[in-house]
């Protein structure tokens, strides 16, 4: 293993150097790992003999680093005891290790040749802007901000950017300032480059240059030229100019706008251009803008915060494959947003269905801010999908994204010879175009997936309702079976006693009507036809889930993207003597990718139409299931009501019978000298020997109650005796003379 100069073998103890992370003007940064604890730290060591002044500044850097504590500034830590020694008469600096590499490594990836994604740009703007603000508040000017001095660390799945190498060791005597920044002059503020006095605004220039490069893929001002050359051409630029390029004629073209292509959505471009105009102002006194008296900070920070606080909803219109973006006021309702969507797309608000990536429909009762996630920025990070509910067939595919002028130029004539330097720019845009086609498909596939998840939610709801329906149907069937058997038994028993006991035509008619209703309600519980339709839909959904078109089909496009990247890499590494080349191979890849996208989009929209058609069937079927369930519940309630009503009637009959039986017993016991014919004497001769059906009713035996009843009715005994005698004389008298009007209740 490689060791820092002066480190004796074994002197590091359990700490082992794993790799060299970087080399600066005066020092090396190496990764050390603890063999047992799996701890990792970055150690910065001096690799040169320093003058006393520079040695003092090195030590000063270490002291300052240990005082800093901010999430976006790399933290210093204690040097392990085993490594705590002097190298070249200066101490080591231990820092937290960031495993994501530096920003330069990210920018050098061929897929980022035309800039980073919007989410990455905004994340960098937030992190490094916060870090610079912290340093400036602590009276620290970095002076050497560049992609190599921005490291990335993954924290809970989120990339955090941190500033490293505060540059104190590079603050050498003013006479050799430029030479101390060898290799980093492209990001230096003009006043540093020209060896003039400077303020904190030098960091604004460097930061603006970095952000521009992250947006476009290259630096803002004549990026292919050395600073000594482009400074003379740029220093008289307009304050609003943020971009300069050299035309084929050699003329320099200035612009106050960001170049295309880039990944920023249209709503961010304008405020970002305004921010860059503040950061890239040549005049250090004007750079960053005036101090905001309310916020007590330069306008550039206020504008940066404004950009980062913008709530923008990105909506993919699945009917046109176009992305539309809206800036959301904090209190906007979803209905208001849908009205804006209607004006933009022509899709009526009532026909709009907005789905999240998980297939959940947006809640119309909640504000429009539900379309954006807290802390998530960029159209590449989160999308809402718009569907037209009035359509179930999405024709697709749609026209591919437009070619840039450069790419269109080589597509029209792939054999034209272009200078390698110019070709690099053209091929970079070609790679960006091919990657864009793949990303367009990926977004549409995600929209199809949201539609599938929505379908599965509808299907789950249908399944739940089906189970409820089947359960209710089975319960109704069981209750009807019980009701029919019980009413049949009641009718049979009623028929047996009506000739000598209690009878009522109204009650009999009511009971028979109940029996007929029960027969009718048995038809309500028949749901087989609905079960068949539901099972058919379940089968259809299962087939859609199994379909290969329900899975990602972009393998060929990814392969073509990689081929385009490989071609671009080869072009970048061509030796200088290869001055010209054609674009035949790159154009083949472009054409093949367009054809591949056309094919997979046809398959995607065909499958999507089936999903939406199936979902519409569920939507049409759900009301039928609800009606059937409502009818079953209504029938169930009616059956239970009829059963209860009949039971009340039976108990009312029993009450009457008990009352009559009690009355007879009381009269018989109080008229000891009176000849009272037995009950059998009241009945017709043919029935006199038969047992009365109500003789099983027990006469009340409570002594106190009977005594009270007798006392209360003494005055009525004479009248009752008369009635009984008349009954004995008139054998034809019966209980039919009683009032049965209660049956009509």
UniProtKB/Swiss-Prot annotation:
Entry annotated with the keyword Ion transport: no
GO biological process, one term: osteoclast differentiation
SUPFAM superfamilies named among the record's database cross-references: Protein kinase-like (PK-like)
Tissues with expression: Ubiquitous only for isoform 1, isoforms 2 and 3 are expressed predominantly in brain and T-lymphocytes.
InterPro entries: IKBKB_SDD, IKBKB_SDD_sf, IKK, IKKbetaNEMObind, Kinase-like_dom_sf, Prot_kinase_dom, Protein_kinase_ATP_BS, Ser/Thr_kinase_AS
Residue ranges occupied by any Protein kinase domain in the UniProt entry: 15-300
Sites of Phosphothreonine modification: 23
Location of this chain's protein in the cell: Cytoplasm; Nucleus
GO terms for MF: ATP binding; IkappaB kinase activity; protein heterodimerization activity; protein homodimerization activity; protein kinase activity; protein serine/threonine kinase activity; scaffold protein binding
Residues noted as binding ATP in the record, renumbered to the chain: 21-29, 44
Activity regulation behaviour: Activated when phosphorylated and inactivated when dephosphorylated.
Active site: 144
Disruption outcome: Mice show abnormal appearance and die within 4 hours after birth. The epidermal cells are highly proliferative with dysregulated epidermal differentiation.
Pfam families: IKBKB_SDD, IKKbetaNEMObind, Pkinase
GO cellular component terms given for this protein: CD40 receptor complex; cytoplasm; cytoplasmic side of plasma membrane; IkappaB kinase complex; nucleus
Modification after translation: Ubiquitinated by TRIM56 via 'Lys-63'-linked ubiquitination, promoting activation of CHUK/IKKA.
Ranges where the record places region Leucine-zipper: 455-476
Superkingdom to which the source organism belongs: Eukaryota
Its job: Serine kinase that plays an essential role in the NF-kappa-B signaling pathway which is activated by multiple stimuli such as inflammatory cytokines, bacterial or viral products, DNA damages or other cellular stresses. Acts as a part of the canonical IKK complex in the conventional pathway of NF-kappa-B activation and phosphorylates inhibitors of NF-kappa-B on serine residues. These modifications allow polyubiquitination of the inhibitors and subsequent degradation by the proteasome.
PANTHER family: IKB KINASE, INHIBITOR OF NUCLEAR FACTOR KAPPA-B KINASE SUBUNIT ALPHA
Family membership: Belongs to the protein kinase superfamily. Ser/Thr protein kinase family. I-kappa-B kinase subfamily.
Complex and partners: Component of the I-kappa-B-kinase (IKK) core complex consisting of CHUK, IKBKB and IKBKG; probably four alpha/CHUK-beta/IKBKB dimers are associated with four gamma/IKBKG subunits. The IKK core complex seems to associate with regulatory or adapter proteins to form a IKK-signalosome holo-complex. The IKK complex associates with TERF2IP/RAP1, leading to promote IKK-mediated phosphorylation of RELA/p65. Part of a complex composed of NCOA2, NCOA3, CHUK/IKKA, IKBKB, IKBKG and CREBBP. Part of a 70-90 kDa complex at least consisting of CHUK/IKKA, IKBKB, NFKBIA, RELA, ELP1 and MAP3K14.
Domain notes: The kinase domain is located in the N-terminal region. The leucine zipper is important to allow homo- and hetero-dimerization. At the C-terminal region is located the region responsible for the interaction with NEMO/IKBKG.
Protein name in UniProt: Inhibitor of nuclear factor kappa-B kinase subunit alpha
Natural source organism: Mus musculus (Mouse)
Lineage: Eukaryota, Metazoa, Chordata, Craniata, Vertebrata
Name of the gene: Chuk
